[in-house]
Amino acid sequence: MTQKLLSINDLSILLPTGADRQYAVEDIGLELHAGETVCVVGESGSGKSLTARAVMGLLPAPHVRVDKGEIIFGDEDITKVSYERLRGLRGSEISMIFQEPMTALNPVMTIGDQIDEIFRYHVSMTAKERAKKALSLLVDVNLPDPAKIIDAYPHELSGGQRQRSMIAMALALGPKILIADEPTTALDVTTQAQILQLIKDMQKRLDTGVLFITHDFGVVADIADRVVVMQDGKIVETGTAKQVLQTPTHPYTKSLIAAIPR
């Protein structure tokens, strides 16, 4: 068995008073191992993205917060560590790529400067070493003309180029876990396939555990080792990708699979 990287146990995330339900997620549990892709699948409002944000310590507290349960990374419970420790974990141990990189990237900094900032915060390197490493990362994610892109601003790039840049930043420090929150939703079909392949290739090279958040079982079929299906904040089905895709048991899972374009 490969190394267990993450264990979520009996996690409940409380919503503000007046929300349509008490908990965004309720009593959920899942595990992620090195070199494995676990897809968390569900429609909007299922709680899948808030689960991912809880792992990163990015819940919009105090309005949305962990009410009970634990998120174990290594020998630490992420729900109980200090803000300083969370900042240290983000990027170096656990990284995240988002659905729309235009909102995640800084619009007034070049791609190179944004990668450089990661190294300046986390690693002791000279400016020359940082610049060389940044360029190497852009080469790794198959960006055309990386020497030009390193000096470009986000608005000067295509959607696919921005997402590749985000992946380069997310993997800059060799994290053990990559959380991908619907990273291909805003992309055309061809670019989506390229980004999924890139994530698979990088994962294989780095032995990263990937927690992939999606509403699309077409993506699941392409990338998942194991699947967790969420509906209204609860896990309704879980299993290997083959089990869930070929012999789903829950009506909600069946309806999501039926929505895959043939």
What are the language-model segments listed below?
Residues 77, 129-148, 257-258:
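Conserved ABC ATPase "signature" region
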Residues 152-157, 161:
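Conserved ABC ATPase signature
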Residues 193-206, 218:
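Helical segment within the ABC ATPase nucleotide-binding domain
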Residues 172-176:
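A short, proline-enriched helix->beta-strand linker immediately N-terminal to the Walker B motif
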Residues 238-239, 247:
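ABC ATPase "signature
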Residues 220-222:
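A short, surface-exposed alpha-helical micro-motif characterized by mixed small hydrophobic
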